[in-house]
Amino acid sequence: MSLLYEGKAKRVFTTNIDGQLRVEYKDEVTAGNGAKKDTMIGKGKLNNQITSIIFDYLTHNHIDNHFIKQLSQTEQLVQQVDIIPLEVVVRNIATGSITKRLGFKKGHTFEEPLVEFFYKKDELNDPLITDDHVKLLGIANDEEIKQLKQMAKDINQVLIQLMNEMSLRLVDFKVEFGKTNGGKILLADEISPDTCRIWDKNTDTNFDKDVYRNNTGSLIETYQTFLNKLEDLK
């Protein structure tokens, strides 16, 4: 097995099975496109366990994804895909960048989920792009754009259902997709408090990486509490 890719939060390794990869979650935490970063022991374990539970839940709710199984506390086995260079963001409630970009008041609830595309390009700081940009860049065609948006909305509905069971609100989240050798689009990467904004329904307390971004609490304790809530649903 050899290292195929290393990002801010994960390492990806080849395996001895064609078409399958081993993903290892790291104890690194970053914010602001890496401007702020720290090592937090146990963070990788938490995100791996959370993502494994959520992807298994999505599988049972008919969302096609790359997850095969959890291998260890920090590792999982996934189907190999070619990652589409888009961060697909779904917003249910206004907060973060959209309040600065478009003037929405924090906490404003959108009548319908808003889906946005961000071009995965570190040197460009992952800019917001339109459907036409996606086509001009050769990232996806009209049919694929339609499919990505629908899959994102379907994921949103399933995650809202899951969060409701934990008395939490899904504010927004970002996901990534990839294509199999046969061209099928699958949900990939991770879904965790690193990639979602999650608020307590009663207190609006954050259960996500904003506690690190804004220095409002312990990231490890927050993620552990979220994992405990997930495990209590089993």
Swiss-Prot record:
Q: Which CDD domains match?
A: SAICAR_synt_PurC
Q: Which InterPro entries does the entry link to?
A: SAICAR_synt/ADE2_N (IPR028923), SAICAR_synt_PurC (IPR033934), SAICAR_synth (IPR001636), SAICAR_synthetase (IPR050089), SAICAR_synthetase_CS (IPR018236)
Matching Pfam families: SAICAR_synt
Highest taxon, organism lineage: Bacteria
Q: Which GO terms describe its molecular function?
A: ATP binding; phosphoribosylaminoimidazolesuccinocarboxamide synthase activity
The GO biological-process annotations, alphabetized, read as: 'de novo' IMP biosynthetic process; cobalamin biosynthetic process
Q: What class of enzyme is it?
A: ligase
The protein's name in its UniProt record:
Phosphoribosylaminoimidazole-succinocarboxamide synthase
